[in-house]
């Protein structure tokens, strides 16, 4: 009987990708099969996020909930950014944890588990062996028509509030050919849509073979678009400072590049952007969006926003609201500022009451939600090209797909359509989803 692993993932799409790789590594090296039921697991792994304090504390709360499973010999491991940041402290705080590993050492999981069994004590490896992990990962195994592909690791921007450079290391790009080989392998398995991943994905600079030449992100997109079977290309997360003219021009040449972009601006006040060390102004950000929409008028934009950064006045907040109005974002990930230990922003004086921050967050989210509704209403009556992903989560008798602009559409249809690209006429707009009907071509 095969051993089973339960992996709980916190945070970003990079972590989702890493969790899939953990399952692949353990399956190839030790025969583990994935399970969605922790009660059936022989190994429980937490792939953690430390971007916000609440996410970090939730990890320790959840660890306590699974502690009782140790009575039947279950192994528990903590990976991801909290592991990288806390290291041995996790063992001190939760001594029943067996292995602690960082984002760059997940490929060493089998070795760590073997060492735990041999030495009868917890094992910790939170080193930064740069790109080594990709050389030790088994070929990707996928189910479905879309897949993530990590093209680089880490970030070298050192924004004043962010722990990523400390938990995932500096930017390191995968070799150009390695990325193309992985994408081609996914296409051979039936994948039609790839999402290229990185903490700062558009800073990609990959080595080309044995030459001294370096491929930038725009060139990588061009080559990925030429791989047979790949019909859509997405990427996340990008940085405004790395949005080069070559990358903007790629939207004119590469129809497989979707008209949806997550480009975190974080704030709309130049004073706050400077304190965040973002390296651009609100006007420069809006200029990038104008250039993109001159090429793709239908470009859907989403962003991250931090409300209540130290020193934020009501005037600063209103500048952020003006930027939201000007850009017309149709989705966002917005949070109240959470000071992270070890970052410069954690030492900044913060005299804004929490209730003021909460009011501002609610006001921002209300505007974004109104944008979502208005843009969804505009889609009614249009025909949208969907990649059918599977059964609808709302109604298991229906199907769901995703538009190029990243909107979920639920519709009645035959399960044989799963994995296919089809046209659907939008018949109704709901709060965060659309409804439609398949367009029959005669």
UniProtKB/Swiss-Prot annotation:
Chief place where the protein resides: cytoplasm
Domain Radical SAM core intervals: 141-374
A family per Pfam: UPF0004
Annotated [4Fe-4S] cluster 1 binding sites: 12, 49, 81
Keyword Transit peptide attributed: no
Catalytic function, reaction form: N(6)-dimethylallyladenosine(37) in tRNA + (sulfur carrier)-SH + AH2 + 2 S-adenosyl-L-methionine = 2-methylsulfanyl-N(6)-dimethylallyladenosine(37) in tRNA + (sulfur carrier)-H + 5'-deoxyadenosine + L-methionine + A + S-adenosyl-L-homocysteine + 2 H(+)
UniProt remark on cofactor binding: Binds 2 [4Fe-4S] clusters. One cluster is coordinated with 3 cysteines and an exchangeable S-adenosyl-L-methionine.
Residues bound to [4Fe-4S] cluster 2: 155, 159, 162
Localization terms from the record: Cytoplasm
Ranges of residues in domain TRAM: 377-440
Swiss-Prot/TrEMBL keywords: 4Fe-4S, Cytoplasm, Iron, Iron-sulfur, Metal-binding, S-adenosyl-L-methionine, Transferase, tRNA processing
GO cellular component: cytosol
GO molecular function, one term: 4 iron, 4 sulfur cluster binding
The MTTase N-terminal domain, residue ranges: 3-118
Top-rank taxon, per record: Bacteria
Cofactors demanded by this protein: [4Fe-4S] cluster
EC number(s) per entry: 2.8.4.3
UniProt subunit comment: Monomer.
Function: Catalyzes the methylthiolation of N6-(dimethylallyl)adenosine (i(6)A), leading to the formation of 2-methylthio-N6-(dimethylallyl)adenosine (ms(2)i(6)A) at position 37 in tRNAs that read codons beginning with uridine.
Family according to the record: Belongs to the methylthiotransferase family. MiaB subfamily.
Protein name, UniProt field: tRNA-2-methylthio-N(6)-dimethylallyladenosine synthase
Protein's gene: miaB
């Amino acid at each position: 009987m095969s051993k089973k692993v339960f992996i709980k993932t916190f945070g970003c799409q990079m972590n989702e990708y890493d969790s899939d790789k953990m399952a692949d590594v353990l399956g190839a090296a030790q025969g583990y099969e994935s399970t969605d039921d922790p009660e059936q697991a022989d190994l429980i792994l937490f792939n953690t996020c430390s971007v916000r304090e609440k996410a970090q504390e939730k990890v320790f709360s959840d660890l306590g909930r699974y502690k009782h499973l140790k009575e039947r010999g279950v192994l528990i491991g903590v990976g991801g950014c909290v592991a990288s940041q806390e290291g041995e402290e996790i063992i001190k705080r939760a001594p029943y944890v067996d292995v602690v590993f960082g984002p760059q050492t997940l490929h060493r999981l089998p070795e760590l588990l073997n060492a735990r069994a041999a030495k009868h004590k917890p094992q910790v490896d939170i080193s930064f062996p740069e790109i080594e992990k990709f050389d030790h990962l088994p070929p990707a195994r996928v189910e479905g028509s879309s897949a993530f592909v990590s093209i680089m690791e880490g970030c070298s921007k050192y924004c004043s509030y962010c722990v990523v450079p400390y938990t995932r290391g500096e930017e390191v790009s995968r070799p150009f050919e390695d990325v193309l080989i992985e994408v081609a392998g996914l296409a051979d398995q039936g994948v039609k849509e790839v999402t290229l991943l990185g903490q700062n994905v558009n800073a990609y600079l990959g080595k080309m073979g044995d030459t001294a030449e370096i491929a930038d992100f725009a060139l990588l997109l061009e080559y990925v678009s030429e791989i047979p079977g790949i019909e859509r290309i997405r990427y996340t997360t990008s940085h405004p400072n790395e949005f080069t003219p070559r990358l903007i021009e790629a939207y004119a040449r590469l129809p497989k590049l979707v008209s949806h972009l997550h480009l975190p601006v974080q704030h709309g006040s130049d004073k706050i952007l400077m304190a965040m060390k973002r390296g651009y102004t609100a006007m420069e950000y809006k200029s990038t969006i104008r250039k993109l929409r001159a090429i793709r008028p239908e470009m859907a934009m989403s962003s991250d926003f931090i409300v209540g950064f130290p020193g934020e006045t009501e005037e600063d907040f209103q500048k952020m609201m003006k930027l939201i109005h000007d850009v017309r974002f149709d989705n966002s990930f917005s949070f109240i500022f959470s000071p992270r230990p070890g970052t410069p922003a954690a030492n900044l004086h913060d005299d804004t009451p929490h209730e003021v921050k909460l009011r501002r967050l609610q006001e921002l989210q209300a505007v974004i939600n109104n944008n979502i509704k208005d843009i969804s209403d505009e889609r009614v009556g249009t025909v949208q090209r969907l990649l059918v992903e599977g059964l609808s989560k709302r109604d298991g008798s229906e199907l769901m797909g995703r538009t190029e602009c990243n909107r979920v559409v639920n519709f009645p249809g035959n399960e044989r359509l799963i994995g296919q690209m089809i046209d659907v006429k939008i018949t109704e707009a709901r709060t965060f989803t659309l409804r439609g009907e398949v367009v029959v071509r005669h």
